[in-house]
Amino acid sequence: PGMELSLFSRDAIAMATAVALSHDVFDGALLLGVCDKIVPGLLIGALHYGHLPCVFVPAGPMGTGLSNKDKSKVREQYAQGLVGRDELLKAESAAYHSPGTCTFYGTANSNQMLLEAMGLHVPGTAFVNPGGALREQLTREAARTVLGITRGQRFAPIGRVVDERAIVNAIVTLLATGGSTNHLIHWV
């Protein structure tokens, strides 16, 4: 199977988000997403209920583990039969060893950057590592922000925030930063 399953899982996440927000009991939504299809799915689902203020809370990238170069070397050795499955799993576990998005600038980290460019994150949160005091403060600030939007003079539901300017900002940011080409399928 190819990317058709990728879009299927994204759309399932979008539907689950839309159903969860459809109960008409919320004043706003704080959306927490990490990996490749989750964040686009949350965004699509939230836009189905564009009347709600929404703030996204990025996971941030996990700290550095085994380098991509070393991980690739072990994968190549495994493909050649030079190392066993245990060594491969050990390398994978060392590379992806903690909470957060992957350590490279792929789809998940591009998601975080694009949503910040669209104005859907607290500014400066896209690449703050999880688990630290700053991440905790920024998450609390996201909660205060969505509450402020729902109660304050600057009521801004997601359907008003995500307009053609926000989408252009996201695409320009994607191109300017060398973000993931997987976003072509999410933006079309």
Where would I find each of the regions flagged by the language model?
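Short helix-coil transition sites and intra-membrane helix breaks within transmembrane domains
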Residues: 103-105, 176-182
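Flexible, glycine-rich loop/tail regions that form catalytic "lids" or insertion modules at the edges
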Residues: 171-173
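Anionic-ligand anchoring segments at beta-strand to alpha-helix junctions in alpha/beta enzyme folds, i.e.
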Residues: 1-8, 182-185
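Active-site cavity-forming subdomains of large catalytic enzyme subunits
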Residues: 6-162, 166-169
